[in-house]
UniProtKB/Swiss-Prot annotation:
Family: Belongs to the UPF0145 family.
Name of the protein described by the UniProt record: UPF0145 protein MADE_1007770
NCBIfam families in alphabetical order: PRK02877.1
Pfam name, any one: YbjQ_1
Length: 108
């Protein structure tokens, strides 16, 4: 599956447009991770636990997006837009949302 932020793919023509596809993942933030991330922010450095959560959520959202596109008969998704949002009480959850257009492509 080809995924791209651009509306076209170099070296490919778009044969069919199948519509908008979306992948979403919501991850809960752990209280202890929050505590250690706050300490790390104070002393400097990167919060590895949050980076892992972001990576996991992003991978899950991409997997969902690609699955939806394949189920429509697409072999690519163009115009990808990736958004992160903090949701829930006191920002207790992270949502990753990816959208794009499912298409059928062939080489030029």
């Amino acid at each position: 599956m080809i995924v791209s932020t651009t509306p076209t793919l170099e070296g490919h023509k778009i044969d069919a447009y199948y519509g908008i596809v979306v992948g979403e993942a919501v991850m809960g933030a752990n209280v202890f991770k929050d505590l250690f991330a706050s300490i790390r922010d104070i002393v400097g450095g990167r919060s590895g636990s949050y980076e892992e959560e972001l990576t996991t959520a992003r991978k899950l959202a991409f997997t969902e997006l690609e699955h939806e596109a394949r189920s429509m008969g697409a072999n690519a998704v163009v115009g990808i837009d990736l958004d992160y949002q903090v949701i829930g009480d006191k920002g207790s959850m992270l949502m990753v949302s990816i959208s794009g257009t499912a298409v059928k492509t062939s080489p030029l």
